Amino acid sequence: MNNLTGILDNKGTPLDKQKFTWKEMAGKPISKLDDDAFTRVRIILMNGIETDALRIKHGIARITGQLRGPLAEIRRVEQHQATMINWLISADHSPLETTVAYEQVAIEVTAAVAQTEPDPYQAQTYRFGLLEDFDHLYRYSAMLDRLEGKDANNILQGYTDIVPGRKTSEHHRHPDNDLRESYAKEEAALITKIHAAMITAAEFQTHDYYMNIGPLFADPLARQLYAEIASVEEQHVTQYGSLADPQESFMEKWLVHEAMEVYAYASCAEQETNPRIKAMWERFLDYELGHLQIACEHFKNIERRDPAEILGGPLPKMIEFKSQREFVRQVLAAEVNMRSSGTQYVDKSEEPQNSLDYRAHLNSEGIASNIVSAGYQWAPGGELMGMRKIS
């Protein structure tokens, strides 16, 4: 896929043909250990994208009356798409194991995006965020070992390192320092808009998952850890969401989101190794092409403009679903001490006082992310971990 403008000739599956049964929605899940980890990465990513598709369409429906019917019809299909995707996670994934998988998505997909993003500032923002999710993975891996005696690498399958990143205890910034500069809609490449919509969707899902699953733990440290990292995920949604131009009309945002869904499904279909799941990605790609066609028609009717104005321009290669280990290591070595001051990135020594004060109060009665990982160091070769105090 070099661009999306040619795709406008592909009508996809008509909306009235996009049908499901309960049985296929709650179908056979993947294997936790036998399927490739990137099959699960794609599943989690696409569930986040579909739930965000519901979210954005609900938002549009609340501010305009003429689209409520069409949006409701598309949302129903996307609800069923999200169900069929999300129900692929098997019941033998514990909530903590699923959490580890969510963080693998955040690391590997964000790292892939950071390397193909043409806007230097936006790419910097993705690198900044991935180092925080990288540390979240380390803290949750320690919790998985502590509570369940399990090796997180059973989920990660060796694709993603388990070492500290930028310390979670230092992620808690004043809200003023989580806002970012937006792309300019008239100047930004389509892929820049797609990236911002995609990563915002993925982080929103992670935030919601932690908010829902965190209170269900009996262990007080686990409850605190989920509370702490869920707060950081809200910061990430703020950060990535602010990358999009607020001057875009709701129709422009709808078009971008549909384009992002097409791009993401095409990426999944191209690289999926499980034939059954690949067929699902291909089916849903056709569904999204149908949704994109509907959005284009409403765009033409409401804004009296050609959708190619929004959907034109080249796209880089598909999202690369592969280990980004070397890139992440390079970013970790170069940028672990980076902080934010307003919308700009600065050295740790220049972090503004309002973030330091904000963090000091939050951390004043104990820091779960530090406690859970005290003495923890992941080591290969079994469920028993080597012990080394992490400062």
Describe each PLM feature range.
Residues 1-391:
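Non-heme di-metal
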